[in-house]
A protein has these predicted regions:
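Extended, charge-rich alpha-helical interface modules
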Residues: 61-134
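Motif-centric detector for short Cys/His coordination patterns
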Residues: 1-77, 95, 126-127
């Protein structure tokens, strides 16, 4: 069987399966911990906690960056974060809506999707660094 990597931006929040307030046995039903998932097109689903946390990386919101003078090494990190995010968004637009992308061979499509995931992880690390600037 072939392997695939999906690239999609979702919204999610912790939720117990079946809408119960706690995990465990409820009558004849076993409710598990998991996440309510909402896709960009509005589709809603539920995912078990372990599967969700293995498949998704939490996207940190961009930090509020004051327009003040910063040491050059910090400003370079901020500039790099914005530059990388701009490139990542362009890549995702290409992946999600380009006829050219659909004509690429599946291996190249997979590499581009992997690249997007790595870029998101990199942006998240840069955001964490920026949030901890003193």
């Amino acid at each position: 069987m072939e392997k695939y990597i999906g690239v999609k931006l979702i919204s999610a929040e912790p939720q117990i399966e079946g809408g119960f307030s706690t995990a465990g046995q409820h009558g004849g039903i076993i409710a598990r911990e998991g996440y309510k998932v909402v896709y960009e097109d509005g589709y809603k689903s539920w995912s078990p906690k372990d599967a969700f946390e293995k498949a998704y990386i939490k996207v940190k919101p961009f930090p509020s960056i004051e327009e003040t003078a910063r040491p050059p090494h910090q400003q370079r990190v901020i500039d790099e974060m914005y530059d990388l995010e701009e490139k990542r968004l362009k890549l995702n637009a290409f992946i999600g809506g380009s006829e050219i992308f659909t004509k690429l061979d599946l291996d190249e499509q997979s590499r581009l999707k992997q690249q997007s995931l790595v870029m998101q992880a990199y942006v998240t690390i840069l955001i964490e660094r920026i949030e901890n600037f003193k």
